[in-house]
Design a protein with these regions (language model features):
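A structural signal for short, hydrophobic/glycine-enriched beta-strand patches
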Residues: 50-230, 237
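Structural signal for membrane-spanning alpha-helices in multi-pass inner-membrane proteins
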Residues: 26-29, 48, 52, 250
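Membrane-embedded alpha-helical segments of integral membrane proteins
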Residues: 1-29
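Hydrophobic alpha-helical segments of integral membrane proteins
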Residues: 3-8, 56, 60-64, 241-248
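Membrane-interface helix-boundary motifs at transmembrane edges
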Residues: 29-37
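Hydrophobic membrane-insertion alpha-helices, especially the h-region
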Residues: 39-54
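Extracytoplasmic/luminal low-complexity segments enriched in Pro/Gly and acidic/polar residues
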Residues: 222-228, 235-255
Length: 255
């Protein structure tokens, strides 16, 4: 199922879908069905316009980010911090060593801040190698270098390095919490990722307090055209589509 989901996403992410529509349109037109080919090419162009030059993706992502708000006040005491992977450049980190954070790096930075403010809290890092090849180190293992570099004792870290998806995060973390006797945890992940994460953690019977970070939208974005940042618009749209597909897929499969 893991490989199927990876291959499926390669095909249906917005830019890939636009390419496939365009290529299919060219093939159909070459075969003599020019009207159908023109229609497919037109759909590809329309999709590219929406992805590159509108705020549609940002608005869709904004809806997800608004689902769970961070508590207005930080708890006086935090005994357990769960942080989900997805914040490291696994390939670069594995080949070069060190820690290379990606755009979701605030997941680890906020966890580090909380860990320093709450020195008794255990830190559960949930995330292995989510690549198709499985050749990389995995985030839970690599993250120890980051936390210890800032003075966090290795004994405070609980590394769950087997999960490759959010669904596996929830199952593996449940086992870790039971084994370590940890309760009353805060869950740190990107705000857009929090709805899917909370749904799965609740389904697994893990009570957690959502602690969203890594916001990608302003929260006041409106639907419209935006010619100023096509690359950023494409990235945001791709992220939004992936999250919404993930939510729907987990719902349909009963997860």
């Amino acid at each position: 199922m893991f490989l199927v989901s990876k291959i499926f996403w390669l095909a249906v992410q917005p830019l890939s879908l636009a390419f496939l529509l365009s290529a299919l349109g060219a093939l159909v037109a070459f075969a003599g069905w020019r009207r159908i080919g023109a229609t497919l090419s037109g759909l590809a162009a329309a999709l590219l316009f929406v992805v590159l030059y509108t705020t549609a993706g940002g608005v869709a992502l904004q809806v997800l980010e608004a689902r769970f708000a961070r508590p207005a006040e930080e708890p006086a005491r935090i005994s357990c911090i769960i942080v989900l992977g997805g914040a490291l450049e696994n390939e670069v980190t594995t080949s070069r060593g060190g820690i290379e954070l990606n755009q979701a790096g605030e997941r680890f930075l906020e966890t580090l801040r909380l860990a320093i403010r709450h020195p008794d809290a255990r830190i559960v890092v949930s995330g292995g190698d989510g690549s198709m090849t499985g050749d990389y180190e995995g985030e839970a293992a690599a993250s120890e270098r980051l936390f210890t570099a800032f003075g966090v004792s290795p004994e405070r870290l609980v590394k769950e390095n087997a999960s490759r998806t959010t669904y596996e995060n929830s199952l593996q973390t449940k086992d870790v919490l039971a084994r370590e006797g940890l309760t009353d945890c805060v869950l740190v992940t990107s705000a857009f990722h929090m709805p899917r994460s909370m749904a799965l953690f609740r389904k697994a019977g893990i009570p957690v307090t959502p602690w969203p970070v890594d916001y990608r939208t302003s929260g006041i974005l409106r639907l419209g055209v935006d010619f100023s940042q096509p690359t950023s618009n494409a990235q945001i749209t791709s992220t939004a589509v992936r999250e919404w597909i993930g939510l729907v897929a987990y719902y349909l499969t009963g997860r």
